[in-house]
């Protein structure tokens, strides 16, 4: 410990000795210049007195810091984390301003470590919960497909076209579930997966509507797309944004009144430096008490209790993706009258691309 202490202050010691030597030289030259004979005793006194005071000062400083430095060394050898060290140092009063700064920094690092560890643990728990829910939801299409195959083998199934249609429905559920699971896994490495680009928003939306065309026809819902006369170019990641809009369209399809010919209105508008994409349905709406929580992970609310396909992850993932792309996503709804989901793109988009 003493060796380390002296090595850390070697520069100060050397410059102090150099200063004493310089003082002796100046005194010697002054005496010689005056014509007197320098006394060895006086010269030694000039050397010994400052040297003794310097040594005494370092000794006092070492004694003052010894207990704290010994304690820190012991903590460094035994503590399991930086937060353990930080908590322990809080109970040990620093002796110097430098020690106080180091203690403050270690405490800050410990808090940062705990925060990141807690975030990681929550992500793992969330991933585990979602995986369990996903497996549970996927059991239904597996069971249905198995039953359909058995009926086909026994010759008790309905007509072949109906059989294929039912099989396609279950396959669609599989596709949607697998896509959500894949995007959940990719979200953890979002910053490495995102690819900013400029593209036509209306063309992307038309493509997604065509992709869900069969669902619109089956549920007797009619999409209408309203776009400005000029092409609307936005900067974003098209793959991730497509996932977000697909989730919003899927929710609009799922929670609209089925088979009555209601419209689902998709509207693109530009206002100054902002572009808005809204998807409005005339479905069952969201209860007021549930609206503030619809973007929380695993929250299904009152409507989720009546919808077997609800996982509580679709809108959560959509919100997370929009936040990381620098877009805003919010919902407006009136129970029994429908819901409007809106994405806002601003001129400073893609400025918050970070990992979860």
UniProtKB/Swiss-Prot annotation:
Residues on the membrane's Cytoplasmic side span 1-11, 64-356
Is this entry keyworded Glycosyltransferase?
Answer: no
Q: How does it sit in the membrane?
A: Multi-pass membrane protein
Q: Where is the Histidine kinase domain positioned along the sequence?
A: 133-349
Protein's cellular compartments = Cell membrane
Q: What does this protein do?
A: Member of the two-component regulatory system YvcQ/YvcP. Probably activates YvcP by phosphorylation.
GO MF annotations for this entry?
A: ATP binding; histidine phosphotransfer kinase activity; phosphorelay sensor kinase activity
List the ranges whose topology is Extracellular: 33-42
Q: Give the top-rank taxon of the lineage listed in the UniProt record for this protein.
A: Bacteria
Give its E.C. classification number: 2.7.13.3
Q: Which residues carry this modification: Phosphohistidine?
A: 136
Its name, as the record gives it, is Sensor histidine kinase YvcQ
Look up the record and report any one GO term of the cellular component aspect. plasma membrane
Its gene name is yvcQ
Keywords carried by this UniProt record: ATP-binding, Cell membrane, Kinase, Membrane, Nucleotide-binding, Phosphoprotein, Transferase, Transmembrane, Transmembrane helix, Two-component regulatory system
């Amino acid at each position: 410990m003493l060796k380390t202490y002296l090595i850390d202050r070697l520069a100060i010691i050397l410059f102090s000795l150099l200063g004493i030597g310089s003082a002796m030289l100046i005194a010697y030259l002054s005496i010689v210049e005056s014509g007197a004979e320098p006394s060895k005793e006086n010269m030694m006194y000039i050397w010994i007195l400052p040297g003794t005071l310097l040594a005494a000062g370092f000794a006092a400083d070492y004694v003052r810091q010894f207990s704290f430095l010994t304690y820190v060394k012991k903590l460094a050898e035994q503590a399991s984390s930086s937060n353990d060290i930080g908590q322990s140092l809080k109970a040990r009063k620093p002796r110097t301003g430098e020690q106080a700064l180091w203690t403050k920094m270690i405490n800050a690092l410990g808090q940062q470590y705990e925060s990141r560890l807690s975030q990681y643990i929550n992500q793992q728990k969330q991933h585990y919960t979602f995986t369990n829910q996903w497996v549970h939801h996927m059991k239904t299409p597996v069971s249905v497909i198995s039953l359909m195959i058995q009926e086909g083998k026994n010759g008790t199934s309905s007509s072949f076209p109906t059989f294929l249609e039912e099989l396609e429905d279950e396959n669609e559920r599989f596709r949607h579930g697998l896509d959500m699971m894949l995007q959940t896994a990719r979200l953890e490495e979002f910053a490495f997966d995102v690819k900013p680009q400029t593209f036509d928003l209306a063309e992307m939306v038309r493509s997604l509507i065509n992709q869900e065309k069969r669902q619109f026809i089956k549920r007797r819902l009619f999409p209408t797309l309203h776009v400005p006369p000029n092409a609307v170019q936005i900067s974003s990641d098209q793959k991730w944004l497509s996932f977000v809009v697909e989730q919003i369209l899927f929710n609009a399809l799922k929670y609209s009144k089925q088979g009555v010919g209601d419209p689902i209105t998709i509207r693109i508008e530009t206002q100054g430096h902002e572009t808005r994409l809204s998807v409005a349905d005339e479905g069952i709406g969201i209860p007021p008490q549930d609206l503030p929580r619809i973007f929380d992970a695993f929250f299904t609310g009152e409507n989720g209790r009546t919808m077997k396909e609800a996982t509580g992850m679709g809108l959560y993932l959509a919100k997370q993706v929009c936040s990381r792309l620098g877009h805003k996503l919010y919902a407006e709804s009136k129970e029994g009258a429908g819901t409007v989901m809106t994405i806002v793109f601003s001129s400073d988009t893609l400025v918050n691309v970070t990992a979860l």
